[in-house]
A protein has these predicted regions:
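Active-site glycine-centered loops adjacent to acidic/histidine catalytic or metal-binding residues
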Residues: 175
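Residue-level marker for buried hydrophobic side chains located in beta-strands
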Residues: 33, 99, 172, 381-384
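Histidine/acidic residue-rich metal-binding segments in metalloenzymes
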Residues: 19, 51-71, 77-144, 151-172, ...
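Acidic, glycine-rich active-site loops and adjacent beta-strand->loop/helix elements
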Residues: 9-10, 35-41, 148-150, 212-213
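Metal-cofactor-binding active-site regions of metalloenzymes
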Residues: 27-46
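Metal-dependent catalytic neighborhoods of phosphoester/phosphodiester hydrolases
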Residues: 14-19, 44-45
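Active-site microenvironment of metallo-dependent hydrolases
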Residues: 183-199, 203-491
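Single conserved hydrophobic/aromatic residue that forms the stacking wall/gate
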Residues: 1-8, 12
Length: 491
C-alpha cells in the first residue's frame, strides 16, 4: 500500500506525516508513505493549516518508510519553475526516490510537456485514452484509477487494448475509496477485477498492480513478485479472473482468511493534539450562510460549481437565481444548492459562500464534512441555511467527520476525530456508518453515485474547472479567483 499523507499535513503540519509514517511502519503489511509536495496545493488561491517546504521534503527523504514525493499538484508552478516546486522535486531526486505526479488539466500541449520536464514520473489524473497514451509516450507511468466515485480505468485501458501500448508502463491504483467500498467490494483486488472485465488478461492486470508498481518505486528487490529473496507477501485465490481471495499472507504470516482477520492489527496511540483540530471561532448561524445580492437586484446570474458523476473534474455552470429580502436563494427546481467553506484551522470565523449543482437534493437538508481536499477546511452543502448551521456546529462538537441533517434532525454521522480526517474505529463500523450516510442522502433525493466523494473534492483547487476555497470561487482553468455573480465581471 502506498499512502500520500497530504491530508494529515494540511491539518497537522509535518508532524502529521511523521505520525502516519510511524504508524505505517508498525503494520504487519507493507504501507509505504510519500511525502506531500503541495501544502497548500495552490499558493495564493487557498490557505491550508500548514506549509510544507523543500527543507521539510529533504528531511522526510531520510525517514525509513518514505519512498518518494507525493502528487505534485501545482502543475502551473512546476512548468514555471516555482522555487518551492523545484526545491521539493530536487530533494527527492537527490535522495534517489520517485516523484509522484498530479496533472489534472486536459491540456496536453506545452503546459503538459513543461510539467513532465519538471520531474514528475507518474500521474493518476487522466480520464481519457489519449491522457494515458500521452503520459506513457512522455516517459511517465500512467496510473489508471478506480475509486469509489472515479471510474477512469475503462476508458484509459484502451491505450493498451486498442492502441497496443506496453502494459509494463501502466499501473492500476485507487484514489479516495471510502470504507464501504473497501469492506464490501475490496481495495486493489476490486481494481484488478475491473481491469480484467475491460479486456486485460488476468496476469497482465495483476502485474499492473504488483510488479509494475514495485519497479516504479524502486521496491522490486523487496516486493512485487513471489520469488526468492522477496518478502513472503502473497494471496491464495480460488478464481484468478474474479480474484476471489481465500487467504492473505504478509511477511510469511497468515493475516486473513475467508474475509476475516486472523491476527489483530496493532493500534496506534495518536496524541490528544491530533484530536483537537476543528478550530472555529464560534458556533455558526443561518446568517453565516447567507449570500447578499447586489443592491436593487431581483435576480442574479450566479456561477455554479457543476458536479460530474463518476468524474473528479467539475464543470462551469451558471444559473439565474431569485433574490428574496436581499439574499440570493438556492433553487431545488434547478438543482442548485448552497455551498460554503468554513475555515477551521485558525478560528478566523471565515465562511465563503457559493452555489453548486449535481447533488439533486430535495427538501430541507445539508451535508457537512471536514474531509475537504486539499486544505481540509469544512465544506457544507445544503438547500437550507438552518440545516447547514446545524451540520457545521455538530462537526465542531465531535471534532470532525461528516454529518447529514434533514428537517432539523441529524440523520447520519461518521466521526473522524483524528485531524478531522480519520477514524480510529474498526473498518466494519465505519463502513456501516458510511452506508447509513449515503442512505440518508438518497432519502433526500441525492442519487449521485458516491456523492460524498464528490462533496469532499469541491475545494480541491488544482482539479478543473470551478472550485471553492477560503479565498473565494476559483477558476482552475485560469488559476484565478472569479466573482460569484456573472454581472460583477461583465458589468
Amino acid at each position: 500500500t502506498l499512502d500520500r499523507s497530504s491530508a494529515a499535513s494540511d491539518v497537522y503540519k509535518r508532524q502529521g506525516v511523521r505520525l502516519m509514517h510511524d504508524e505505517a511502519l508498525a503494520q504487519p503489511v507493507n504501507v509505504y508513505v510519500q511525502m506531500p509536495s503541495c501544502v497548500p496545493s495552490a499558493p495564493g488561491l487557498e490557505l491550508a493549516g500548514a506549509t510544507i517546504t523543500p527543507d521539510d521534503v529533504a528531511e522526510a527523504m531520510t525517514w525509513p518508510g518514505i519512498i518518494g514525493l507525493g502528487e505534485v499538484m501545482n502543475f502551473p508552478g512546476v512548468a514555471a519553475n516555482d522555487p518551492t516546486m523545484v526545491g521539493g522535486i530536487a530533494a527527492t531526486v537527490r535522495a534517489g526516490k520517485t516523484v509522484g505526479g498530479h496533472y489534472a488539466s486536459p491540456d496536453l500541449g506545452l503546459p503538459f510537456h513543461g510539467y513532465v520536464a519538471g520531474g514528475p514520473q507518474d500521474d493518476h489524473e487522466g480520464t481519457r485514452m489519449k491522457d494515458a497514451a500521452a503520459r506513457v509516450r512522455q516517459g511517465m507511468k500512467a496510473m489508471l484509477r478506480l475509486g469509489s466515485a472515479w471510474y477512469d480505468v475503462a476508458e484509459q485501458v484502451k491505450a493498451i487494448t486498442e492502441l497496443g501500448l506496453d502494459s509494463r508502463n501502466f499501473i492500476l491504483c485507487t484514489d479516495d475509496s471510502h470504507s464501504g467500498t473497501l469492506v464490501h467490494d475490496g481495495h486493489m483486488n476490486r481494481v484488478v477485477r475491473h481491469a480484467i472485465a475491460q479486456g486485460l488478461k488476468p496476469v497482465t492486470a495483476i502485474q499492473m498492480a504488483t510488479l509494475n508498481t514495485a519497479e516504479h518505486f524502486g521496491l522490486e528487490r523487496e516486493i512485487g513478485s513471489i520469488t526468492p529473496g522477496r518478502r513472503a507477501d502473497f494471496l491464495i485465490v480460488s478464481n484468478l479472473a474474479e480474484l476471489s481471495i481465500d487467504m492473505v499472507f504478509a511477511g510469511g504470516r497468515k493475516l486473513a482468511e475467508a474475509g476475516r482477520l486472523v491476527e489483530d492489527m496493532p493500534a496506534y496511540a495518536y496524541p490528544e493534539s491530533a484530536r483537537q483540530t476543528v478550530r472555529m471561532k464560534r458556533d455558526l448561524t443561518a446568517d453565516d450562510f447567507a449570500v447578499p445580492a447586489p443592491a436593487g437586484a431581483n435576480s442574479v446570474t450566479a456561477r455554479v460549481i457543476g458536479v460530474v458523476e463518476n468524474q473528479a473534474p467539475t464543470r462551469k455552470a451558471e444559473a439565474r437565481l431569485a433574490v428574496v429580502s436581499g439574499l440570493v436563494e438556492s433553487d431545488v427546481e434547478q438543482d442548485v444548492a448552497h455551498i460554503a467553506l468554513v475555515e477551521r484551522h485558525r478560528a478566523t470565523g471565515g465562511v465563503t459562500n457559493a452555489f453548486v449543482s449535481g447533488f439533486r437534493y430535495e427538501g430541507r437538508c445539508a451535508l457537512a464534512s471536514t474531509v475537504a481536499h486539499d486544505s481540509h477546511h469544512m465544506i457544507v452543502v445544503g438547500t437550507d441555511r438552518e440545516n447547514m448551521a446545524l451540520a457545521a456546529n455538530r462537526l465542531r462538537a465531535v471534532g470532525g467527520g461528516v454529518v447529514f441533517y434533514a428537517d432539523g434532525q441529524e440523520k447520519a454521522l461518521v466521526e473522524m476525530p483524528i485531524a478531522g480526517l480519520m477514524s480510529d474505529e474498526r473498518a466494519e463500523i465505519v463502513a456501516e456508518k458510511a452506508t447509513a450516510l449515503l442512505e440518508a442522502m438518497r432519502r433526500s433525493g441525492c442519487t449521485l453515485n458516491n456523492a460524498y466523494m464528490q462533496h469532499s473534492l469541491l475545494a480541491l483547487v488544482v482539479i478543473p474547472s470551478l472550485r471553492i476555497s477560503d479565498q473565494g470561487l476559483i477558476d482552475v482553468d485560469s488559476f484565478r479567483k472569479v466573482p460569484l455573480f456573472v454581472e460583477d465581471e461583465t458589468g
